[in-house]
Amino acid sequence: FALESFWDGKGNASAHAMEMTK
């Protein structure tokens, strides 16, 4: 997946990314 999907613009892990990596 793209880093943009894992990190939001503020440099925090996005909720969607956490769901994908869970």
UniProtKB/Swiss-Prot annotation:
GO cellular component, as recorded: cytoplasm
Keyword terms: Amino-acid biosynthesis, Cytoplasm, Metal-binding, Methionine biosynthesis, Methyltransferase, Transferase, Zinc
Cofactor(s) essential for the protein: Zn(2+)
Catalysis performed (reactions): 5-methyltetrahydropteroyltri-L-glutamate + L-homocysteine = tetrahydropteroyltri-L-glutamate + L-methionine
Subcellular location: Cytoplasm
Purpose of the protein: Catalyzes the transfer of a methyl group from 5-methyltetrahydrofolate to homocysteine resulting in methionine formation.
Name of this protein: 5-methyltetrahydropteroyltriglutamate--homocysteine methyltransferase
Record organism: Pseudotsuga menziesii (Douglas-fir)
